[in-house]
């Protein structure tokens, strides 16, 4: 186990009350969170989303990506279902950090795509560690999920880490003229499944 469960509190939202659970990485002290809606116990697979932190999309409403749209849609789906989990994976910018993400945006403004921009900065296309998320599911007592994602790599890594993904639920929202090239690049170079 790479994390420990350290705190929890009620989080009232326009969609209803979630339980916010805080986790801490044992090696680094970095924190992550999960929003739990309803009763996630029992044998029925839980609707879940692993959402990687995106300050620009989630909080600042950027149109450069689909992250904020996905966050809102995932929470709505979970609330409508009556039970589920959203893991808020605190690895900003596919885990290159906010400052490098801003640098990558500047490179994209010069014509690089999102993958090329990461490479120009010395990073892989995706630096995230989804095994942490598998540990969060386990600490919540969940090992079977219906995963809201377009990323087959996320499914593969979580499965290898012991989470049974019984269904991949597409989450295709937020396409606009500002992020078309970004989404096309994610499909072409990173294998994301973005066609309905």
UniProtKB/Swiss-Prot annotation:
Transmembrane stretches, start-end: none
Pathway listed: Cofactor biosynthesis; riboflavin biosynthesis; 5-amino-6-(D-ribitylamino)uracil from GTP: step 1/4
GO terms for MF: GTP binding; GTP cyclohydrolase II activity; zinc ion binding
EC number: 3.5.4.25
Gene Ontology biological-process entries: riboflavin biosynthetic process
Pfam families named in the record: GTP_cyclohydro2
Cofactor(s) for this UniProt protein: Zn(2+)
Positions bound to GTP: 49-53, 70, 92-94, 114, 149, 154
Hydrolase is among the record's keywords: yes
InterPro entries registered for this protein in UniProt: GTP_cyclohydro_II, RibA, RibA-like_sf
SUPFAM superfamilies in the cross-refs: RibA-like
Reactions catalysed according to its record: GTP + 4 H2O = 2,5-diamino-6-hydroxy-4-(5-phosphoribosylamino)-pyrimidine + formate + 2 phosphate + 3 H(+)
Binding-site list for Zn(2+): 54, 65, 67
Domain of life: Bacteria
List of catalytic residues: 126, 128
Any one GO CC term of the record: cytosol
Cofactor, how bound (note): Binds 1 zinc ion per subunit.
Similarity field: Belongs to the GTP cyclohydrolase II family.
Main function: Catalyzes the conversion of GTP to 2,5-diamino-6-ribosylamino-4(3H)-pyrimidinone 5'-phosphate (DARP), formate and pyrophosphate.
Subunit description: Homodimer.
Protein name: GTP cyclohydrolase-2
Lineage, top ranks: Bacteria, Pseudomonadati, Pseudomonadota, Gammaproteobacteria, Enterobacterales
Gene designation per UniProt: ribA
């Amino acid at each position: 186990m790479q994390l420990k469960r350290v705190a929890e509190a009620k989080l009232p939202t326009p969609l209803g009350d979630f339980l916010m659970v805080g986790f801490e990485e044992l090696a680094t002290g970095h924190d992550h969170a999960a929003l739990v809606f309803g009763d996630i116990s029992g044998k029925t697979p839980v609707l879940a989303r692993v959402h990687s932190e995106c300050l620009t999309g989630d909080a600042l409403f950027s149109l450069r990506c689909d992250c904020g749209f996905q966050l809102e849609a995932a929470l709505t789906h979970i609330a409508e279902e009556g039970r589920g989990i959203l893991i808020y994976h605190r690895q900003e910018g596919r885990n290159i950090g906010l400052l490098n993400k801003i640098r990558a945006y500047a490179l994209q403004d010069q014509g690089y795509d999102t993958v090329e921009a990461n490479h120009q900065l010395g990073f892989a296309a995706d630096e995230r560690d989804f095994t942490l998320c598998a540990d969060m599911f386990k600490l919540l007592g969940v090992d079977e999920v219906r995963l809201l994602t377009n990323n087959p790599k996320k499914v593969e890594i979580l499965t290898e880490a012991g989470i049974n993904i019984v269904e991949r639920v597409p989450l295709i929202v937020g396409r606009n003229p500002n992020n078309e090239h970004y989404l096309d690049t994610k499909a072409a170079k990173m294998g994301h499944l973005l066609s309905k």
